[in-house]
Amino acid sequence: MEPPTYTRHRRSACDDARVSVADHQTLRVLEGRYVLERAVPGVEVARDGEVLAVVHGPDGGACMRRQDDADDAWVALWNGDDAHPPDATGMLAAIVAPLAVGNVPVWVAASFDGDIVMIPADQVDQAYELLRRAGHQVVD
């Protein structure tokens, strides 16, 4: 039995007068390259300008930290520059779905105003193309 395939239906103006804000997001590329590190339980993470995000979880958590010379670096995209209603649905899904279709791995952290989506630095060209084809704008 073959796995199901999924096609994303994009609503047109003929379907409905509303256009989802999730379908056309501006993603700003944050300066620098980042590494993902496991947060050690009980050890405080330095809160200097080099730490982008810290996530605490059942496993201890993780840290997104800037390290421009890292061998396995990640690039950070930010979707929080444009205001959107807090009850807007599908914001993150609209970003990660086209990347998943293209086999581009992601690591994500949420902030109050938006999401940080990390993609491997060696796959940025492919990721940017997938995102643009999905209707998003990627800007430096």
Q: Model segments located where?
A:
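Regulatory modules associated with amino-acid/nitrogen control
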Residues: 2-105, 126-140
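A short glycine-rich beta-strand->turn/loop micro-motif centered on a GG-aromatic cluster
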Residues: 105-114
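Phosphate/ribose-phosphate-bearing ligand recognition and processing surfaces
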Residues: 117
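Conserved short segment within the HATPase_c
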Residues: 123
